[in-house]
């Protein structure tokens, strides 16, 4: 149904005229720290202006997707500033066809054709990329330096966010820090260049535009926090009061939200208070798992605080979550409470001998021969020495991190959170430690810090303990010490886990093959009862105990393992020169693949250009460290 509707929209006749769209913005910013060949200085730009040939405007540096022309480029004190004209009916058709009709739903009057196009192109291609020709270090810049300007999602140069509008003045107006001389000069030059175009339009083709716009989305789908980056580039360019750039998380136009539902509380007994319709449902709240929250929740009751039980505001709209920077993990509140309850519940793991190897199936010899002295003892064999219950629980490690965080907050002058216990004592005791004023109305009250005996005078104020004062005025070195202690604790736990895989009193001698006393007699072959993979193998880096025998070769570290011979691979025989390939299997011949438009081959001309458009890269190691940490912590449970 949807494909038929899209086909009808594509096959609909094109509009008679194209909507002229003006685009304006900085092509680069001076002293912005652009790396390498992307950096431009005022002298280079001054030598390259005005361009020798008109600069085309294309999409994502595709020469076959030209949609407009640059009208003027002016050297502003902040960087080169340009104004261009876009007039392409096919670009409007592709964007309108791909966009859903729900994007433009609104309570007020319907948006015009120009407004819909401005919303789509502004939010899909909010940046530009200037393509320059590569030149040597000794080659001076000339008027052929600039090649073209490309509309893209995110440019590599800073501050290259552009504005689109149907009038020239409206496109330039949002740049509040633009020099007045630059504003007048670019307006005059753009008006003169527009007269020379005489209503020209561009038509690169619907198919070429479709593939180019799709490649733009694919190349930037891995971009993290795209709207945050766009907002930052927008501030760098000095844009204020922009109308069509939507840096929000909702996939609708401002003012397109449906009418708010009436407030219905469950305590007022209003009809429909228990309505479970999708419109009235509220998603489960998300909480940020911080170390101090885990520590405070594990030491207190597993029930959440009253403020956490009702995160929805009085208006019925859920509070927006704080923006994450990648240092927090977002999980539902119900799963968070289950994790806290499971961590705080007491565990009584079975006691195991210190350094005992892990339990496993051991391959013994003949059933009637008894246990061999060379095999390791069973896991239940009593060993003298200290017994321990495995690694310490997760609460101890988190408590160390919480102490470091609390010390860091005290060092920075920030008040400790409600769940932080990094500093001894409560707020009540710290309140009594401060010096009281000279005229204290509560002078007659007994001091709670000193014992009171009837008939005796009030004791003198106790001086502040130097150790307490030093602890309260902790410096950065104590914070570092606490962090080092936490890391050391984790390293010790890892060492204990590794030690458990070794024998308690050194490695065991290698296991020799079992020789049956009646092996000389002919007996029918019996299949092995135990798999060979369960044979105990001592670590190869530890030598057997005891002095080596003189004149004898030490036994190998690993016992010989029988390998079942498999079928030998066929030998490669060189084929004669007159050999023919095997005939294809009988059947209908598959139809040839549909020919798709191939991307433009990077020729010598393309290699001589410096394009400033960016593409997000795939990072396969994003969460590998976090997964390893979680697996180690959960493995000790």
Curated annotation (Swiss-Prot):
Cellular compartments per GO CC: host cell cytoplasm; host cell nucleus
Motif Nuclear localization signal, chain ranges: 428-431
EC number: 3.4.21.97
Enzyme class: hydrolase
GO molecular function per UniProt: identical protein binding; serine-type endopeptidase activity
Keywords: Host cytoplasm, Host nucleus, Hydrolase, Phosphoprotein, Protease, Serine protease, Viral capsid assembly, Viral release from host cell
One BP annotation, GO: proteolysis
InterPro entries referenced in this protein's UniProt entry, alphabetically: Herpes_virus_sf, Peptidase_S21
Region feature Disordered, mapped onto this chain: 262-326, 414-479, 502-608
Biased composition (Basic and acidic residues): 432-450, 457-468
Annotated spans, Interaction with pAP: 326-345
Composition skew (Low complexity), residue ranges: 277-317, 595-608
Active-site residues (renumbered): 61, 129, 148
Interaction with major capsid protein: annotated span: 617-637
Positions marked as site (Cleavage): 247-248, 612-613
Entry keyword annotation includes Phosphoprotein: yes
Bias (Pro residues): 537-559, 566-594
Entry comment, domain topic: Region of interaction between pPR and pAP is called Amino conserved domain (ACD). The region of interaction with major capsid protein is called carboxyl conserved domain (CCD).
Family (UniProt): Belongs to the herpesviridae capsid scaffolding protein family.
Protein name: Capsid scaffolding protein
Organism from which the protein derives: Human herpesvirus 2 (strain HG52) (HHV-2)
Taxon lineage: Viruses, Duplodnaviria, Heunggongvirae, Peploviricota, Herviviricetes
Name of the gene this protein is made from: UL26
């Amino acid at each position: 149904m949807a494909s038929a509707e899209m086909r009808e929209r594509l096959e609909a006749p094109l509009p008679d005229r194209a909507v002229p769209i003006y685009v304006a913005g900085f092509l680069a910013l001076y002293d912005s720290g652009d790396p390498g060949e992307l950096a431009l200085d005022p002298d280079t730009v001054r030598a390259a202006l005005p361009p020798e040939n008109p600069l085309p405007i294309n999409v994502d540096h595709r020469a076959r997707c030209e949609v407009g022309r640059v009208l003027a480029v002016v050297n502003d004190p902040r960087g080169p500033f340009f104004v261009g004209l876009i007039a392409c009916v096919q670009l409007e058709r592709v964007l309108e066809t791909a966009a859903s009709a729900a994007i433009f739903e609104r309570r007020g009057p319907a948006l015009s054709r120009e407004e819909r196009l401005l919303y789509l192109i502004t939010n899909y291609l909010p940046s530009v990329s200037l393509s320059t020709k590569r030149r040597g270090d000794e080659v001076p810049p000339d008027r052929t330096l600039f090649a073209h300007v490309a509309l893209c999602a995110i440019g590599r140069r800073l501050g290259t966010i552009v504005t689109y509008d149907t009038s020239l003045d409206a496109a330039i107006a949002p740049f509040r820090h633009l020099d007045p001389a630059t504003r007048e000069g670019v307006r005059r030059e753009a008006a003169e260049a527009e007269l020379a175009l005489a209503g020209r339009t561009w038509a690169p083709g619907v198919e070429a535009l479709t593939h180019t716009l799709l490649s733009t989305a694919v190349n930037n789908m891995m971009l993290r926090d795209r709207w945050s980056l766009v907002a930052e580039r927008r501030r760098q360019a000095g844009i204020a009061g922009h109308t069509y750039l939507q840096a929000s998380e909702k996939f609708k136009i401002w003012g397109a939200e449906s009418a708010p539902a009436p407030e219905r509380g469950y305590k007022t007994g209003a009809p429909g208070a228990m309505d479970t319709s999708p419109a009235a449902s509220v998603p489960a709240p998300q909480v940020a798992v911080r170390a101090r929250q885990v520590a405070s929740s594990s030491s207190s009751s597993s029930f959440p605080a009253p403020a956490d039980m009702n995160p929805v505001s009085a208006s019925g709209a859920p509070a927006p979550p704080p923006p994450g920077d990648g240092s927090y993990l977002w999980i539902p509140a119900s799963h968070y409470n289950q994790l806290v309850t499971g961590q705080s519940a007491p565990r009584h793991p079975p006691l195991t001998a210190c350094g005992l190897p892990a339990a496993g199936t051991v391959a013994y010899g003949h059933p009637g021969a008894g246990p061999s002295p060379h095999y390791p003892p069973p896991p239940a064999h009593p060993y003298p020495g200290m017994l321990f219950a495995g690694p310490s629980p997760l609460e101890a490690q988190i408590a160390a991190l919480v102490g470091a965080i609390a010390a860091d907050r005290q060092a920075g002058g920030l008040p400790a959170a409600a769940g932080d216990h990094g500093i001894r004592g409560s707020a009540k005791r710290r309140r009594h430690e401060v010096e009281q004023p000279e005229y204290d109305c509560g002078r007659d009250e007994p001091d709670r810090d000193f014992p009171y005996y009837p008939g005796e005078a009030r004791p003198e104020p106790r001086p502040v303990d130097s150790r307490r004062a030093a602890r309260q005025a902790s410096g950065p070195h104590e914070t570092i010490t606490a962090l080092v202690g936490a890391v050391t604790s984790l390293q010790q736990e890892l060492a204990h886990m590794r030690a458990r895989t070794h024998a308690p009193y050194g490695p065991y001698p290698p296991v020799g093959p079992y020789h049956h006393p009646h092996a000389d007699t002919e007996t029918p072959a019996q299949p092995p009862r135990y798999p060979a993979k369960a044979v105990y193998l001592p670590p190869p880096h530890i030598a057997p105990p005891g002095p080596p025998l003189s004149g004898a070769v030490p036994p190998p570290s690993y016992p010989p393992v029988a390998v079942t011979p498999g079928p030998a691979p066929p030998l490669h025989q060189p084929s004669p020169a007159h050999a023919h390939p095997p005939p294809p299997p009988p059947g209908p011949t598959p139809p040839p693949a549909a020919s798709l438009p191939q991307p433009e081959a990077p020729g010598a001309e393309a290699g001589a250009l410096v394009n400033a458009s960016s593409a997000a890269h795939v990072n396969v190691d994003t969460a590998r460290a976090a997964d390893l940490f979680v697996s180690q912590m959960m493995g000790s449970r």
